[in-house]
Amino acid sequence: VLGTEEACTGDPARRAGNEFVFQMLAQQNIATLNGYGVTKILTTCPHCFNTIKNEYPALGGNYEVLHHATYLQQLINDGKLKVEGGAYKGKRITYHDSCYLGRANDIYEAPRTVIEALDADLVEIDKSKANGLCCGAGGAQMWKEDEPGNKRINTQRTEQLMEVYPDVIAVACPYCNTMLTDGVKTENKQDEIKVLDIAELIAQNNGY
């Protein structure tokens, strides 16, 4: 754990077109990571995962990079993480695919395997996996003011997810979590539908 030595990966800067800031942040991180001899990195953000895995190698940062969805799946499959408690047994859970986890890195099944381990009722919407709609935060859009239009993207995506009447909308990305939480609040459904990261689901199920 690097603490204050860890800087942003630079993903938002590069997506927003500020290559100078991206290069500065990336090189700072790579120097720190290489200085400690880091070989494996676990991320909880698909944006960080994609940047470190696919963009840092060109700058001298070569690491084995895991997203926590894959890591949790491995722990469950290897019997190192017991999913006990049954807090979500039979609950209707739909999963929103992160763009950078799914389309960019083809990780679709790992988060679903984690949800299924809860003995929950995993319900898919029509627009899922490669056909899923962005939550509205990708490409540095999270930091932009709203553009003219009839509906915010996060509201549209939330409405799609609500079509299957879920108890929980599961995510594996902090950006998606924020955008869909706001979407649920916009629909005044925050008392009925929870937006939770798959790691939160496991932790709550196991009593943490």
Task: Give the ranges of each region predicted by the language model.
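Iron-sulfur cluster-binding electron-transfer modules in prokaryotic oxidoreductases
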Residues: 1-208
